[in-house]
């Protein structure tokens, strides 16, 4: 009985991983060119990475230390916004509030999101000192050895652990024109499936009520497990048929000293912050506008909405992830919010509905929703590549929607792998 209790999620997870690969197979450009041995290796790598992260004791210690640093940065940033904006930025309240009204005083744009500026400044400083560059180079070398990807793609993929859709391609800018179609698709997919070191801290802040002190460990784990998933799914949808592109780290920091690096990073963080706010307002407003139009079309008591339609699409995916039947609709709705709007809104909603979900489902969804795979990110993706490689516009525009589908499959696979071992691994 006890063995069956632990065995069923593993079997369901294997079925789920096979299901996601089958979906990718259905939209593959060249099914005969798929190298199934590499696909299988990618699936095994996801499981191995997760087990290593949670079974090797010092891994947990490292992530707890990182989490402590992030918590300190969060408190320092909140102190700074309190100084600048007063109580609306997290400073002392000049009036009394009831406990029920306390939550309404949380202003996302002025209290949680400014953490982006702090981490961007720190990341810029670490890049100038060469610390971040060495980490990225090491990851690129590791990916090349394990997954047999070209050196340029290895650096590009590993860069996405720390950088975003628009920043990571700059690390291999001289090689972008030379990338094969499969490599370009993989780079686009990892940009949408991944997140950034800057935003990881923001995830931890928003999910503090769900993840507690294990927040940073789970967020980083979700990002790392997604990397082999990206290579797996991308190689199914757009198999490699050309010679891989070699390359090395080519990014040079434009600052001439540490102070300038810190300043440039802070301003860059400000641009990212403004971009997040603008995109959230624009996308949420557009979705609400379309929803109001769809509300005019109804069948009896059934009213249409973009999120509602996407919820129906997501229900089979959350089943493949291993979400119980009685929680599938809520989970699918959260995934739909993540794709239609963004993961920040979905994480906020998760905090509201979490009492209707069991802890395992909560964690599966956290892993599945980590990443930039949403409609607005396609605009950022196309805008970035349009500036960097305008000569390949027709190619990356055509691949962009497939990259979004692939990214959703990849993050869903991360949630599936987590669900397979939930309750077995000690740190969960």
Each model region followed by its residue ranges:
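Structural signature of hydrophobic alpha-helical transmembrane segments
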Residues: 6-18, 111, 304-305, 365-377
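Hydrophobic core segments of alpha-helical transmembrane domains in multi-pass membrane transport
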Residues: 16-27, 42-54, 116-125, 194-205, ...
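Interfacial/capping segments of alpha-helical transmembrane domains
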Residues: 51-88, 244-246, 290-313, 326-334
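Hydrophobic alpha-helical hairpins/lids featuring a short glycine-rich hinge
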Residues: 75-145
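Juxtamembrane inter-helical linkers in multi-pass membrane proteins
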Residues: 136-171, 243-261, 304-312, 334, ...
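Alpha-helical membrane segments and immediately flanking helix-loop junctions
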Residues: 144-207, 331-405, 409-413, 417
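Long, contiguous bundles of hydrophobic transmembrane helices that form the permeation core
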Residues: 223-272
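Transmembrane helical segments that form the transport core of multi-pass membrane transport proteins
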Residues: 267-354
């Amino acid at each position: 009985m006890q063995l069956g209790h632990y065995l069923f999620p593993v079997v369901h997870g294997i079925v789920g991983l096979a299901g996601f690969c089958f979906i990718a197979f259905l939209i593959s450009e060249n099914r005969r060119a798929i190298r199934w041995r590499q696909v299988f290796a990618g699936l095994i790598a996801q499981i191995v990475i997760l087990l290593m992260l949670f079974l090797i004791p010092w891994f947990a210690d490292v992530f707890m230390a990182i989490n402590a640093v992030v918590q300190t940065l969060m408190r320092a940033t909140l102190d700074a916004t309190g100084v600048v904006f007063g109580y609306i930025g997290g400073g002392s309240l000049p009036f009394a509030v009831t406990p029920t009204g306390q939550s309404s005083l949380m202003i996302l744009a002025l209290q949680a999101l400014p953490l982006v500026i702090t981490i961007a400044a720190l990341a810029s400083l670490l890049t100038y000192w060469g610390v971040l560059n060495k980490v990225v180079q090491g990851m690129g070398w590791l990916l090349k050895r394990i997954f047999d990807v070209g050196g340029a793609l290895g650096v590009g993929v590993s860069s996405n652990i720390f950088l975003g859709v628009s920043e990571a391609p700059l690390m291999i800018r001289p090689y972008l024109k030379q990338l094969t179609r499969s490599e370009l698709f993989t780079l686009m997919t990892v940009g949408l499936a991944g997140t950034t070191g800057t935003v990881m801290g923001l995830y931890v802040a928003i999910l503090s009520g769900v993840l507690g002190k294990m927040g940073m460990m789970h967020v980083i784990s979700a990002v790392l497990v997604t990397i082999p998933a990206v290579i797996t799914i991308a190689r199914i949808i757009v198999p490699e048929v050309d010679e891989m592109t070699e390359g090395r780290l080519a990014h040079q920091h434009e600052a001439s000293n540490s102070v300038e690096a810190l300043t440039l990073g802070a301003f860059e963080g400000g641009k990212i912050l403004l971009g997040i706010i603008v995109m959230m307002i624009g996308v949420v407003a557009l979705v609400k506008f379309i929803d109001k139009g769809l509300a005019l079309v109804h069948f009896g008591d059934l009213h249409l909405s973009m999120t509602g339609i996407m919820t129906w699409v997501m229900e089979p995916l959350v089943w493949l992830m291993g979400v119980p039947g009685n929680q599938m609709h809520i989970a699918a709705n959260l995934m739909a919010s993540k794709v239609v709007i963004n993961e920040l809104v979905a994480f906020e909603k998760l905090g509201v509905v979490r009492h209707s979900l069991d802890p395992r489902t909560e964690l599966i969804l956290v892993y599945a929703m980590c990443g930039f795979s949403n409609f607005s990110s396609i605009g950022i993706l196309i805008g970035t590549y349009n500036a960097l490689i305008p000569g390949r516009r027709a190619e990356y525009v055509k691949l962009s929607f497939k990259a979004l589908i692939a990214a959703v499959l990849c993050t869903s696979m991360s949630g599936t792998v987590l669900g397979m071992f939930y309750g077995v691994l000690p740190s969960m």
